[in-house]
Curated annotation (Swiss-Prot):
It comes from the Eukaryota. This is Serpentine receptor class r-10. Keywords: Cell membrane, Cell projection, Chemotaxis, Cilium, Glycoprotein, Membrane, Olfaction, Receptor, Sensory transduction, Transmembrane, Transmembrane helix. Belongs to the nematode receptor-like protein str family. Interacts with odr-4. It comes from Caenorhabditis briggsae.
Length: 342
């Protein structure tokens, strides 16, 4: 598809994703406050993820990122809503990368908690105060690694300036160079003889990114598998326990699939395609498309799977529907009475 068509799709996903993320996470925060008493410390982790998801959606809507892969180079381009300096634009792009990395890391922490709760309950004390404060500190390390690499190892050069200008002029005619900031992941360059060589500085940064992403995925997969394995061992439990285990299993499967489909797989393509000189061009924007939708999907799964949350939401809408029907019937009866008196 053309770059202009992808811009339309990405901007639509931005509106839909932001609206869904804001509404679903506000509902989840309300449910956590009023129906989350039995979740223990996990509700604080869920609340943090909900607040972060809303914040992340706001950052995405402000920076309006697009992605492009061409000539063994991956471009992360942010469309400016305001006029600011090139350096501030670079900082903003690195900050977006930090938020992007945080979504990976926090998802991994979710699975660690679920693993502790199912397999190592004695370790759950690590999610209580004061140990709870160590988790944000630990999570900040890979996040800062990702952001620092994005800022320091991918400088703007004459080559990247010419390359991003060519990309905009060729694929995104409605975007002017002065209205964007960018980070260019250059995998290969050419010497004065036209011989291609690996650009080690940028490749090192890509390795750091890929390591952080792979580490969180491995944690998520191992914790998910061990949790699933533990659940299967409790088949002889009571009907009520089996029902609860079934709910948790569904949540576990969906919470594994959603990040894999909307985060890990697209980001894996983002790093691998340039290495093999696969020119996705504007089609790389499917990564942005997925990232806009993900923050609203994960909490929606929790609302639909956790019975107390689901029943509360359904009762709310059913009650509103019932009240609407009753009001309509009352209005109809009143009108009929007026007609009868005349």
């Amino acid at each position: 598809m053309t770059g202009e068509l992808w811009l339309t799709l990405v901007d639509t996903a931005d509106i839909v994703g932001f609206s869904m993320t804001f509404c679903v996470n506000i509902v989840l925060l309300f449910l956590l406050k009023n129906r989350g008493k039995n979740l223990g410390t996990y509700k604080h982790l869920m609340a943090f993820f909900s607040v972060f998801s809303i914040f992340y959606a706001i950052i995405e809507s402000i920076l309006r990122p697009i992605m492009h892969i061409e000539n063994a180079t991956f471009f992360l381009i942010s469309r400016k809503r305001f006029n600011y300096s090139t350096r501030l634009g670079k900082i903003n792009s690195a900050f977006y990368c930090a938020c992007f990395a945080t979504s990976f890391v926090v998802s991994g922490v979710h699975f660690v908690y679920r693993f502790f709760a199912s397999c190592k309950p004695h370790l759950l004390r690590s999610f209580n105060m004061p140990y709870l404060l160590l988790w944000p500190l630990g999570c900040s390390i890979p996040v800062m690694m990702w952001a620092s690499v994005s800022y320091f190892l991918y400088p703007d050069t004459a080559f990247t300036e010419a390359a991003v200008t060519n990309v905009l002029n060729t694929h995104y005619h409605s975007i002017k160079k002065d209205n964007v900031s960018y980070i260019a992941y250059v995998y290969y360059q050419y010497d004065e003889n036209g011989v291609r060589y690996v650009y080690l500085k940028n490749l090192l940064g890509c390795f750091v990114h890929y390591f952080v992403m792979s580490a969180t995925f491995v944690v998520m997969f191992i914790c998910g598998y061990l949790t699933w394995k533990t659940m299967r061992k409790h088949k002889t439990a009571s009907d009520r326990t089996r029902q609860l285990q079934k709910q948790l299993f569904k949540a576990l499967v969906l919470q594994t699939l959603i990040p894999t489909i909307f985060m890990y797989a697209p980001t894996g393509v983002m790093f691998i395609a340039p290495f093999f000189s696969i020119n996705l061009n504007a089609n790389a924007n499917f990564i942005v498309f997925c990232s806009f939708l993900y923050p609203g999907l994960d909490p929606l799964i929790l609302i639909l799977i956790i019975r107390d949350f689901r029943q509360t939401v359904f009762k709310f809408f059913c009650l509103r529907k019932k009240n609407s029907v009753d009001e309509s019937r009352s209005t109809t009866r009143a009108n009929m009475s007026q007609v009868a008196t005349h």
